[in-house]
């Protein structure tokens, strides 16, 4: 009998091509879950899937842009068609321009809200009916400490405040259906995203995370 905690479970991780999403996928696979890994960078997904399989896990890549509702829906449907269930949905895909409001373009506004807010809504909307039918499921939403604390990054912070609020509201809506909702609000994590931040914003995030 397997001692892995997630044997028999099926998980879908968005934003799995790097950073926190990649780490989450590896951890889930190590605990026995079948892991669907989704992102736009298929080459990286294939590399990650190979690493998981070589370690004895089960993973399959799905190329998807979560800002496209049709692609996000198809991503979830692919998991359901292949495995018949979806137990864990981790919405890790995210993007940010950690800069003051006047230094952020309108194109960047749209991009942050498209990925950080609409992208996760599309995936959740597609997954919820099956989770309700199962009577169980776990939805994980990647927010950020910047959604709670003040930083010179108005638009990014606003998008993450929205994700935190949505997680809290969704938890109240679907708890009766046996579905758990978790919001993760980390400070600065050593990933590609943080490495592209301005130094003052990165240091501010680390300072707040330590207090």
Placement of each model-derived feature along the sequence:
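Conserved glycine-rich cofactor-binding loop
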Residues: 10, 17-18
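Conserved glycine-rich Rossmann-like NAD(P)H-binding loop of the short-chain dehydrogenase/reductase
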Residues: 31-48
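The beta1-alpha1 cofactor-binding region of Rossmann-like NAD(H)/NADP(H)-dependent oxidoreductases
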Residues: 42-43, 63-74, 106
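Substrate-binding pocket helix/loop in short-chain dehydrogenase/reductase
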Residues: 100-101, 108-110
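Active-site loop-to-helix junction immediately N-terminal to the catalytic Tyr of the SDR YXXXK motif
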Residues: 104, 150-158, 169
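Active-site helix of classical SDR
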Residues: 124, 159
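Residue(s) in the substrate-gating loop at a strand-loop-helix junction
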Residues: 144
């Amino acid at each position: 009998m397997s001692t892995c905690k997630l044997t028999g479970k099926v998980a879908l991780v968005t934003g799995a091509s790097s950073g926190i999403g990649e780490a989450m996928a590896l951890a889930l696979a190590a605990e026995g879950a079948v892991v669907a890994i989704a992102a736009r960078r298929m080459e990286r997904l294939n590399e990650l899937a190979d690493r998981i399989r070589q370690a004895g896990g089960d993973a399959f890549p799905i190329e998807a842009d979560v800002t496209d509702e049709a692609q996000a829906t198809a991503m979830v449907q692919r998991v359901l068609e292949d495995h018949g269930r979806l137990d864990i949905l981790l919405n890790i895909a995210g993007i940010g321009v950690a800069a003051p409001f006047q230094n952020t373009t309108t194109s960047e506004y749209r991009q942050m809200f498209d990925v950080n807010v609409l992208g996760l809504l599309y995936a959740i909307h597609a997954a919820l009916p099956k989770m309700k039918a199962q009577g169980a499921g776990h939805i994980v939403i990647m927010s950020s400490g910047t959604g709670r604390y003040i930083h010179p990054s108005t638009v990014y912070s606003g998008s993450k405040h929205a994700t935190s609020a949505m997680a809290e509201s969704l938890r109240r809506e679907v708890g009766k259906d046996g579905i758990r909702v978790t919001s993760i609000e980390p400070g600065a994590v050593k990933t590609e995203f943080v490495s592209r931040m301005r130094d003052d914003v990165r240091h501010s995030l680390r300072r707040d995370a330590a207090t």
